[in-house]
Amino acid sequence: MASNKIIGIDLGTTNSAVAVMEGNEPKIITNPEGGRTTPSVVSFKNGEVQVGEVAKRQAITNPNTVKSIKSHMGEAGYTVDIEGKKYTPQEISAMILQYIKKYAEDYIGDTVTEAVITVPAYFNDAQRQATKDAGKIAGLDVKRIINEPTASSLAYGLDKKDRDEKILVYDLGGGTFDVSILELGDGVFQVLSTNGDTHLGGDDFDQKIMDWLIDGFKQENGIDLSQDKMALQRLKDAAEKAKKDVSGVQEAQISLPFITSGDNGPLHLEKTLTRAQFNQLTNDLVERTKQPVLNALKDAELSFSDIDEVILNGGSTRIPAVQEMVKSLTGKEPNHSINPDEAVALGAAIQGGVLTGDVKDVVLLDVTPLSLGIETMGGVFTKLIDRNTTIPTSKSQVFSTAADNQPAVDIHVLQGERPMAADNKTLGNFQLTDIPPAPRGVPQIKVTFDIDKNGIVNVSAEDQGTHKKQNITIKSNSGLSDEEIERMKKDAEANAEADKKKKEEADLRNETDQLLFQTDKTLEELKGKVSDDEIKKAQDAKDALQKAKDDNNLEDMKAKKDDLNKIVQDLTVKLYQQAQQENQANGGQPTGDQGDGKKDDDNTVDGDFEEVNPDDKK
């Protein structure tokens, strides 16, 4: 019989950890080697799959070794080729999860079938789906995907549920850097904002030491150790050890006897790395973490004075220079009360306890990292859900058709921050068909975005008249990579002015189309009610606007649009005055022309269909 316990797994880029609730406290489960964390490394040797420390020890010397596979989760088409067989990131991750599951079962003494798995706050829909798939392959029912900073805050906040606090979580792991701002109060954990650098972590600090050792050895002996795989493996291990040593003491001894051979026999590498040298080598890496912190604060609309506590997460936060920088930047002493390698797994175990009912009065509110919406007329990206919106969430908006008797609408689902659809990431496409023939703007198409508790997106479109419905669940091969998220945000900042201009141009074209369409309807209604000269004047102005649009002359289009607008408004006023006079002449009885059923289009966005303000229908 399977255990009713839900284990909490921190599936990390460099290291992973697992914990379980024991009574009221989460407890880290050690691996067979006695380690409290397990390297996220898989190696294949003579048909045998090895995971963890034993795989890490051959990471450079054995070409059939896979590490940092997490950085490829959700990447469409990505595989690793091992001994003629292709493996997806989900399959490699599943091997790590299977290993963790097995030693967790040995500890618990029963079969484990359910887990809570953490992901970086930046993980998008595709990457979250891929993580769930990896769990499924490993034989785990993933009950919840939660953000790593949320999990670590849960670990820190369990004993202080009665206090309202705003917390900054600074998470510098092996391969990625994340910073999140959270609000804790009354047992509710709400993410206010997230930011980070997906190419920055402890591995980069190791590489700085390796480069320093390689350069020094080359200068002294004329031999490039970077070309020697066996030497590189030893250098990698020595660099990681030196980083840890110099984080605890003022200097570290690096001794690698028989590192290679020269013309006169064996050569040895002997070096002393001081903390000051290490700080100098890695200063640029520490500095790179500042801007994401400032960005996260800006997105949360907070200042450092609003932050009550700073939590350090990830093994790389043990580096003294990192701690000093965080203290200097925030003006607060960072909280070290929980092992930074273990906080995420402990928090995941607590969430497992919440799901089984063992932990009471705790609610997690995560956020979506990027805005979601659809493409509307003119190639505009119309957002339905803004980034940093708390999930789970649902948002609906009513649109309409852009042409008379339009039989179908294409729903182009996008994720990103740019105003034009082409500059954002396509998540999926689907079509709502069999729309009954009707004039443009009459059909009511309700588009709904649902994001579940795991951050997975479902989009539906429903014809309000026929109640015909179509929907799409965004699958893993259509998501964004972390790199794309970073690129989008940077592009959005760098191209803000150009984007604004494109958006204004698209809006002008949409307004022009709407005015031309409305003018045709108005002129048809005015026939016989105003003079032919007035009709001709309006028709000439309409033709002039049409020509400016066809010539793509934006300045002329703007001027001609204003001219036509004024003429049509004057004619409409005249029409209403005539109707009012007729009404008075008829003794106050309403005429058939008043309240002609036309809806107010002032708030209409002409989309791939046309947006209708639902309030206008009330």
UniProtKB/Swiss-Prot annotation:
Domain of life: Bacteria
Record-listed Phosphothreonine modification sites: T176
MF terms in GO: ATP binding; ATP-dependent protein folding chaperone; unfolded protein binding
Acidic residues bias locations: 603-618
Region named Disordered: 526-557, 578-618
InterPro entries for the chain: ATPase_NBD, Chaperone_DnaK, Heat_shock_70_CS, HSP70_C_sf, HSP70_peptide-bd_sf, Hsp_70_fam
Transmembrane segments: none
Low complexity composition bias: residue spans: 578-593
Annotated keywords: ATP-binding, Chaperone, Nucleotide-binding, Phosphoprotein, Stress response
Pfam family for this entry, one: HSP70
Induction: By stress conditions e.g. heat shock.
Gene3D superfamilies tied to this protein: 1.20.1270.10, 3.30.420.40, Actin, Chain A, domain 4, Substrate Binding Domain Of DNAk, Chain A, domain 1
Membership in a protein family: Belongs to the heat shock protein 70 family.
Function, as annotated: Acts as a chaperone.
Full protein name: Chaperone protein DnaK
